[in-house]
């Protein structure tokens, strides 16, 4: 496949056109008065959204050189989304502004590498200023404010605040589509996993179709339970104790299952059996988690423990177990706080050390089950398009709220960046083109506020000048079109989101500015024409 190559200013200008096309599509959504973008889908109806990263992901440009620029700036949005979960539009607008200012100076003879050094130094200084200005987020009201700003919806903000307050910072908040019109919050206490009873005959609550037991013993077994003679001695000890039994094993088969069912129907023993969730190492790890939660021991032949010899001392216990057709919940296991804290600390270390996003996600789920709980926000809406748009906003709000709890908040609406730019007034003591790099970033930091104001129908330049004169913490509230104390008004952004936007925008802009050539594949038709059949005279 033959290639096309562009060099120097021509290459950089092509990249800039790509950056501009993507950024111009995204930045109309910035701020509380930002507009929506409609995305056509290959299947199904169109999606209407104001979520920067969702828009960026859809954009592929026809011109291959411009497309390179668009893909580079798309990576700013996705990276910011991965780290902070929100702030993708801010990051895109910043990258565009740094690229534009940088290219202007390169065309006037500035050295791209020196500019890059200045841009880096400026980004580091801005991050330092943001972290210094951060206020910790405490309490449901503060969390709800962050979520409200992110989602532009007070109801969503309140719900996210409630969810995170209930499950804690380690808890999991998942967002699902509801089959009704209402948006609701469902909190699960205790440890829950997606496996239900092996037989409907275990049900104790016929109306709810669930097996519900109080003060139950919990048997954790790593293999299949198939032999009744091996299992009977333990079953008899449980029957003598008079307590109900929850069995979690790889499987319970044959005569063991039928014996449990018959005894449950006759009420001679209260028991319910479920399969252990997951496979392989994940199943082993999850059973170990359950052992910590219930204060029991996982019985398995690897460590010399067999069912035949097991006593009640190896069983865990829980204040309440609820088993439905699809899921099992263990509430208030008998594990000690110290053991659970130790296990949580171990999982945190594993999360820090893993390189795999998938592994990290699964470890975080396990951590949430152990440490906090699980909250599900079920999003409802009148139409499918509306539902998708609302779900995007709820997901952004959850991510923003978590980021705020992690690193604190700064005044929102782009004001924190404008005020952080004053830290760059002396060009950080740098000279020449490095100082020019700092100046490029200083000017670019005005861009998010400029576009928030422009999208609200005001003159962006006038608003940025006014905000620069305001005291720290004060700025422009685009929702009410007033100036004032943004923290008091609840117009706040998570530091993590703003910081990630600055770092990622500076990084990608530097790459574009220091590009001297761009190589792309030649479009297929051109290749065919050149190697074409036939002959000319």
From Swiss-Prot:
It comes from the Bacteria. The keyword Nucleotide-binding applies. One of its GO terms (molecular function) is ATP binding. Its main location: cytoplasm. It is found in: Cytoplasm. One of its GO terms (cellular component) is cytoplasm. The keyword Acyltransferase does not apply. CDD domains: GroEL (cd03344). InterPro entries: Cpn60/GroEL, Cpn60/GroEL/TCP-1, GroEL-like_apical_dom_sf, GROEL-like_equatorial_sf, TCP-1-like_intermed_sf. Pfam families: Cpn60_TCP1. PANTHER family: 60 KDA HEAT SHOCK PROTEIN, MITOCHONDRIAL. Together with its co-chaperonin GroES, plays an essential role in assisting protein folding. The GroEL-GroES system forms a nano-cage that allows encapsulation of the non-native substrate proteins and provides a physical environment optimized to promote and accelerate protein folding. Belongs to the chaperonin (HSP60) family. This is Chaperonin GroEL 2. The lineage of its organism: Bacteria, Bacillati, Actinomycetota, Actinomycetes, Mycobacteriales. The gene is groEL2.
